Amino acid sequence: MASTFTSDTLPADHKAAIRQMKHALRAQLGDVQQIFNQLSDDIATRVAEINALKAQGDAVWPVLSYADIKAGHVTAEQREQIKRRGCAVIKGHFPREQALGWDQSMLDYLDRNRFDEVYKGPGDNFFGTLSASRPEIYPIYWSQAQMQARQSEEMANAQSFLNRLWTFESDGKQWFNPDVSVIYPDRIRRRPPGTTSKGLGAHTDSGALERWLLPAYQRVFANVFNGNLAQYDPWHAAHRTEVEEYTVDNTTKCSVFRTFQGWTALSDMLPGQGLLHVVPIPEAMAYVLLRPLLDDVPEDELCGVAPGRVLPVSEQWHPLLIEALTSIPKLEAGDSVWWHCDVIHSVAPVENQQGWGNVMYIPAAPMCEKNLAYAHKVKAALEKGASPGDFPREDYETNWEGRFTLADLNIHGKRALGMDV
């Protein structure tokens, strides 16, 4: 079945591939509407549970302390709660004063190298299908602050804890090493007080069209595409490390497998100030994957999916999921926020923002063959101060003063870049 439409590279005629895919999957699934209705009922129960908690003022996001992670005191119940919700907040991941110091050092780094004078505007249109403006993203990767956080013991401990929530061994194969994560350099967000922003519409990353057409994703989502939804486990890593997103040149993609996306707060954050929201239901990806197979979606479309863009989730096609969007709680600088790689997320709009909204994006990307290959490219980019391969080639930092260099790597950093230590 899969060989009739799957492709490791972007099909020349992706709309024809979508039509072929729908024909094959409908034949395989049988009564798609009945399967989708049952899934919708299950998801609706979860949505009601989430919204009841919100109405009572109870926490939806699991919150744990870094001290408990470090001491090995996280309970089985807390682990299960993270797996049920697909997200977590780590309080006190870094001391607040250290995070505020990093924030100031980022500003000093930008000012010293006259970033405002040399900045040429956004280098990509990755979020182009979403209703909203871009958050204030700076294409900076190699500041001391970012790299110190990435190679810190605190980050390594948190990443290992999160990676171990997954099933990473099956059928005699270890899909990844949970205790070493590669450095995945990403950008920073700096959003000043008084900002008015449209935010960012609900979406998922790690492939859009790919989730239907890639052979590896067909294996990842086999139980969704064959209708065995009760057997689908979003926490099983089998075949996820074999996924290679389509190459659409000089835009944003993700060449690594991330167990969790994440960011670390560099400022305190108040509710209602343009914060991250998620749909805290990891299984909602099954709803997203099956929805385009229903009769009301044009035969060559996937509910707004386009090559080289994020996967949009919208009120038009996914109203049940949008209903469950849930904000992160109040944060302090030094707290970190994490969400499963399939989890739908958005950034809320804000008018006249109170306080700063500054973060550095640092995910959990455990060591495996795919991630090691990218880590070697990261090392080469670090040597030159170049933009990493997954991002537009803007290369602002090549001659910047004060940027992080190979000589600044500690043992965690060297291990995370696949260097012999």
Swiss-Prot record:
SUPFAM superfamilies: Clavaminate synthase-like. Pfam families: Gig2-like. InterPro entries: Gig2-like (IPR010856), IPNS-like_sf (IPR027443). This is Uncharacterized protein YbiU. The gene is ybiU.
